[in-house]
A protein has these predicted regions:
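Canonical Radical SAM [4Fe-4S] cluster-binding loop centered on the CxxxCxxC motif
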Residues: 2-32, 44
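Short Fe-S-cluster ligation motifs
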Residues: 40-55, 320-328
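Activation segment
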Residues: 16, 61, 242-244
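Flexible mid-to-C-terminal extensions adjoining Fe-S/redox cofactors in radical SAM and related proteins
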Residues: 247-328
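Radical SAM/AdoMet-radical enzyme domain recognition
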Residues: 4, 34-51, 60-179
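Radical SAM enzyme [4Fe-4S]-AdoMet core and its adjacent flexible, acidic
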Residues: 7, 114, 118-134, 138, ...
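Pocket-edge positions in alpha/beta enzyme catalytic cores
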Residues: 25-29, 56, 124-125
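Residues that line or immediately flank small-molecule/substrate-binding pockets and catalytic motifs
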Residues: 23, 54, 179
Length: 328
C-alpha cells in the first residue's frame, strides 16, 4: 500500500453527465484532518504517492494548498497528484504548482468544445470549463507534469480519436484515458470505443515515430478495480477505506462495508489490504449485471490499447534515453 487519497470535498461546480460522485450533503475535509492523514500515511505506512480528489478539490483551496505544503516536509511523499476540472486554476495557483517540486496536475478536458460542453455542465454561475482551461494553455505550458484526462462516455466513443487529436493540437502531450465506467454500454458503442482506441493508437505511434513527445499515463497504472482507486483513502468525514467506491451515489451504502477505521482509530496495513481484496466482489454483487459487464468490457478495451502500445513505448524510451533533451 503506497498511495494516500484525500477526498478533500465532494462539492463540485460542474455536473458531468457520466460522473457518479455524490455532490451534496457531505462535509469537506478540514485542513487539520488532511494533515493528520498525511502524518498517518507516512508514520504508519511508510509514505509513497499522495492524491487529492473530490468532487472538485479546488472548491476548498485552503485545504489543498495547506496539505500540499505540509507534504513537503516528508521526503517519503514522492509525488502529489491534484485532480481538477480546471475551473479553480488561476495565475496564482499555476505559479504555486510551477514551483512545487512534487506536483502532478491532472485536468479533465474531454476533447472538442461541443463534446466537452455537452457532458460537463457548469452550475452555480461557474464559467465554461473548456474556455477556462484552454485560456490557460500558454501558462500551463510552463507548469511541469500537466496531464489531461480525456473521459470517453458512450456517446462520444465514435469520436474518441478525433477528440484526442484535438487535445494534442491544443499543445497538450501528457494524457490519461478514461472510458465511462459504471454506466451501461450497448455493444455497438463498445465496438466504437475499440475503433476510437485504434485511432488514438495510430496518433500515438505516429508521434513516437516522428520523435515527438507523448505520454500516456494508462501505460503505467494498474488498479485492481476499474476507475476507483485503492490505497489508504481518507473520506471527507475522516473515515478510512481501502477504495473510494463510496464516492458513487449508487454505491454509497457500501461505505459501511468498506470502512476499516478512521483518523482517530486507524487500521493496520493488513486490515486495509484484506478489505481491498473484497471490493470487486462487493461491486459485482451490488451493481446491475449490465453495468458491471459494461465496466469490464470497456476496461478490457483500454487494456487492449495499452498492451498494443508497450513494444513501441519501449523503443521510444530507448530513443529518448539516447537523447536526454527529449525525456519527459
Amino acid at each position: 500500500m503506497s498511495t494516500l487519497i484525500l477526498t478533500v470535498t465532494r462539492a463540485c461546480n460542474l455536473r458531468c453527465v457520466y460522473c457518479p460522485t455524490v455532490k451534496d450533503g457531505w462535509p469537506s475535509l478540514s485542513l487539520e484532518d488532511a494533515k493528520r492523514g498525511v502524518d498517518l500515511f507516512v508514520e504508519r505506512y511508510g509514505g509513497g504517492t499522495m492524491k487529492l480528489f473530490g468532487g472538485e478539490p479546488l472548491m476548498v483551496p485552503e485545504v489543498v494548498r495547506g496539505v500540499m505544503e505540509h507534504a513537503l516536509r516528508y521526503p517519503s511523499i514522492e509525488r502529489v497528484y491534484l485532480s481538477t476540472n480546471g475551473l479553480g486554476l488561476d495565475a496564482g495557483w499555476l505559479d504555486f504548482l510551477r514551483h512545487y517540486p512534487k506536483a502532478v496536475l491532472t485536468i479533465s478536458l474531454d476533447g472538442k468544445p461541443e463534446d466537452n460542453r455537452t457532458f460537463r455542465r457548469p452550475v452555480g454561475g461557474a464559467p465554461d470549463a473548456y474556455d477556462h482551461v484552454v485560456g490557460l494553455r500558454d501558462a500551463l505550458a510552463s507548469v511541469p507534469r500537466v496531464v489531461i484526462t480525456q473521459t470517453i462516455p458512450p456517446r462520444t466513443a465514435a469520436r474518441a480519436a478525433e477528440n484526442f487529436q484535438h487535445l494534442v493540437d491544443l499543445g497538450f502531450w501528457r494524457f490519461n484515458l478514461l472510458p465511462g465506467y459504471y454506466i451501461p454500454w450497448q455493444q455497438e458503442r463498445v465496438v466504437e470505443l475499440r475503433r476510437g482506441f485504434d485511432g488514438i493508437r495510430r496518433i500515438i505511434l505516429d508521434r513516437w515515430a516522428k520523435g515527438e513527445r507523448l505520454y500516456l499515463r494508462n501505460l503505467f497504472t494498474l488498479q485492481p478495480t476499474p476507475f476507483f482507486n485503492t490505497g489508504m483513502i481518507v473520506d471527507t468525514d475522516a473515515t478510512i477505506h481501502p477504495s473510494n467506491v463510496g464516492l458513487s451515489g449508487s454505491l454509497d451504502e457500501l461505505l459501511g462495508e468498506t470502512r476499516v477505521g478512521s483518523l482517530d482509530d486507524p487500521p493496520s496495513r493488513e486490515a486495509i489490504e484484506a478489505k481491498a481484496a473484497s471490493i470487486n466482489g462487493l461491486l459485482e454483487h451490488k451493481l446491475p449485471p449490465r453495468v458491471w459487464q459494461s465496466t469490464l468490457a470497456v476496461d478490457a478495451e483500454l487494456t487492449r490499447l495499452c498492451r498494443s502500445l508497450y513494444p513501441a513505448w519501449v523503443r521510444d524510451r530507448a530513443r529518448r534515453r539516447q537523447r536526454p533533451e527529449d525525456a519527459a
